[in-house]
């Protein structure tokens, strides 16, 4: 992962070197090829940093398997990930992106200085491609991450607050 979040459930981060090997990707593709699997849910951090991510997505979509990419939005702003947003859109990958809050101070306090700004740029890049517009079929879901040992608030008012604030502040 390109971030170091204290709450990370997979203990990912830029100093970690482990990644799923090419042989394991081949096994996943073989399993998908056998049939019966409708959705491939790829989780991160930033699973796009795996050297075999695009090959896995292409294979899954070629088999008619829905692909979900659970990621952070800042990965779209990494120089070595040029064309990633376009790749995801071209393959109709559903994006489940972590955005812990719609306020920059809260996000940067949880994830590091500048993370909010890069997240908004990534979100705008996805929106420009049709993600979240309700017409393109490109699905974008934002995930709220509570800070501390607490449950999140009810989804409907939280979703509306995100939409209202992000729309008014960033278009």
Language model features with spans:
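Twin-arginine (Tat) signal peptide motif
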Residues: 1-4, 119
């Amino acid at each position: 992962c390109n971030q170091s979040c204290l709450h990370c459930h997979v203990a990912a981060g830029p100093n970690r070197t482990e990644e799923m090997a090419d042989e394991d990707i081949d096994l996943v593709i073989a399993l998908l090829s056998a049939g019966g699997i409708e959705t491939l849910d790829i989780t991160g951090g930033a699973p796009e940093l795996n050297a075999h991510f695009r090959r896995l997505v292409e294979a899954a979509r070629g088999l008619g398997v829905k692909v979900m990419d659970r990621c952070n939005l800042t990965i779209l702003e990494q120089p070595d990930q040029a064309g990633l947003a376009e790749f995801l859109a071209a393959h109709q990958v559903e994006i489940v992106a972590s955005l812990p809050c719609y306020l920059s101070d809260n996000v940067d306090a949880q994830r590091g200085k500048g993370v909010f700004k890069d997240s908004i740029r990534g979100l705008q890049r996805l929106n420009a491609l049709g993600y979240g517009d309700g017409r393109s079929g490109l699905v974008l879901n934002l995930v709220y991450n509570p800070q501390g040992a607490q449950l999140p608030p009810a989804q409907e008012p939280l979703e509306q607050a995100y939409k209202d604030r992000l729309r008014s502040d960033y278009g």
